[in-house]
Amino acid sequence: MTCTDTLGCVEVAADEPVTVVAMHVLSGPVSFFGQDSTGGIEIAIDDYGDLLGHEINLIFEDSQCNAEGGQTAAQKAAANAAVVGVLGTSCSSAATAALPIISEAGLSMISSANTSPTLTEADPAKGGVWQPGYYRTAHNDLFQGRLAGEFAYHQLGARTAATIHDGSPYADSLQQVMADVFTELGGRITYQGAVNVGDTEMLPILTEIATDPPDVLFYPIFQPEVNFVTDQIQGVSGLEDTILMAADAAFSSDIMANTGESILGLYLTSPLVVGDKYEELLAKWDAKYGGLPPSAFHGHSYDATMMLLQTIESVAQDDGSGNLLIGKQAIRDALSAISGFSGITGNLSCSDTGDCATGEALGVYQINDMEAWPPEIVLPE
């Protein structure tokens, strides 16, 4: 066999496995995201079995939840000539740094949890950082931000809102979309500001917000900062009646224990997956790991893995003796052509810049019970 692929090929000998790298956050305060996604990957590989007679070799790299982690993980993946594809990252900040490296190496990367609109925006003038080879089964936060803005205005009856982000591409983009939608509907934004990752003292920003008390505070930030904001706002004069709303960055089964009873009443926008396929996944999770997944993107991760493995199998050339030749551009072309993929999270069709999901698998939850996980679903009703 001869490689004619414009980006080159990965050769897999008959006695070698097909190698895939999973780049997720495996350490630190939000490692539950990585646990959630890697569980979905492992179950998908269990279900898939061999790929054209080859075992699947899954390599884990800790992309953390920052640019440095994403860059390091991507460099390791790109340096390994055996790698056929990449699954990840968890966080948009890690993906922003990883993407140029992965793209330059000719690899394809499918994320199950990146949601920042910038990652699939091709125009740098609009903040876009998209590079060829990037795909995601997670929603674009243009959908989640709209959901948050509409829910605040229509269901909560809010007419004023404030937002807090942490400077990350994810949080900054999401709060801005929410603010734009809320304003379009007729609402007024009283404050937009940021905390730093690592901050523990939130009273200064909360006191500033209280100078013009909003009906709702939207703060799509991660633990532990989201815990500190939720807890410390309770003692701020003027914010006693402000409704609190966070997002999928805070959607974790340990958020109640990490925050305390001040968490009660908090709204969360986050993925909402339903159906028989999803129930089967949960049963497999319980059998393999015990209990329930710790966050919300395990279904998306399962879908991303199945998409990648099916794509690899569809483009691989087999010499009849089990030796494979897998074209890198062929993988990209096949992923970009995906339409109507029947996944656990819905029907997926990939855009020219890698957005494969719609906003169908999104909902709003409210934490009303310190012992219940997942929280009560309030939208859709």
What feature does the model see in each segment?
Residues 1-381:
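Extracytosolic ligand-binding ectodomains
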